[in-house]
Regions:
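Cysteine endopeptidase catalytic domains of the caspase/legumain-like
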Residues: 1-220
Length: 220
């Protein structure tokens, strides 16, 4: 919800163009992505898309693929999740100026408190990396088999806290390159200080856009 408010008040996005879904079911996720596709299509390449997800992710233990876990999904059954590969395909095909994705989730099977969510073996799983396509860049809260930790005293995940902090400090007028550097540095430091374990956010741009994404801004 906090990111939604920042989109409207800090980035200046029109309220009608911002959708917020809490406790999203699998059908909710699919419906909202369809809405985004429809809206972007009518702007005929003039719009920019921002997708933010905070929640659980789970791994497929057989092929190491990653899934978002909706509220009606089961941590032990990936067929009840939404494949990250499908998300990237849907967003990467948008006919937009840019697509920026923020995922405050990990896909190792671990919960924010360090317990295991899905893995029958009780060990974190390193999922395979999905490569973004189109005009898309993806910011993820953690890499490989890491856990995306909470920042309990701040009421957010570590990743989301520093994302919002930088947007607030700059009033949204910051390049994605500088935003990514800031988030990665601060989350790595704070995760070690607070949890004693490294959480290292990653930034994955589509190969077709080169380094051009580093000059993109969310508010312009």
């Amino acid at each position: 919800k906090a990111f939604t408010e920042y989109c409207k008040k800090t980035l200046g996005l029109p309220e009608k163009n911002v959708r917020f879904i809490t406790n999203a079911t699998l059908n909710n996720i699919k419906h909202e992505i369809k809405w985004l596709q429809d809206v972007i299509a009518v702007y005929k390449g003039e719009a920019k898309a921002i997708f933010y997800y905070a929640g659980h992710g789970i791994p497929n233990e057989q092929n190491k693929s990653a899934y978002l876990l909706p509220i009606d999904g089961y941590g032990s059954d990936v067929t009840t999740g939404y494949a990250l590969e499908d998300l990237y395909k849907a967003l990467g095909s948008l006919p937009s100026k840019s697509v920026t994705v923020f995922l405050d989730a990990c896909f190792s099977g671990a919960k924010r408190d360090g317990d295991m969510l899905a893995s029958a073996r009780g060990v974190a799983i390193k999922v395979k990396q999905n490569n973004p396509t189109g005009n898309m860049v993806v910011f993820t809260a953690a890499q490989g088999d890491e856990t995306a930790y909470p920042y309990k005293e701040k009421g957010h995940g570590l990743f989301t806290y520093y994302l919002l902090k930088k947007l607030q400090e700059t009033k949204g007028d910051v390049t994605l390159g500088k935003l990514g550097d800031y988030i990665k540095t601060q989350v790595e430091r704070q995760s070690i200080v607070t949890n004693g374990k490294l959480q290292s956010p990653s930034i994955l741009p589509a190969s077709s856009i080169g380094n051009g994404w580093k000059e993109w801004k969310l508010n312009k």
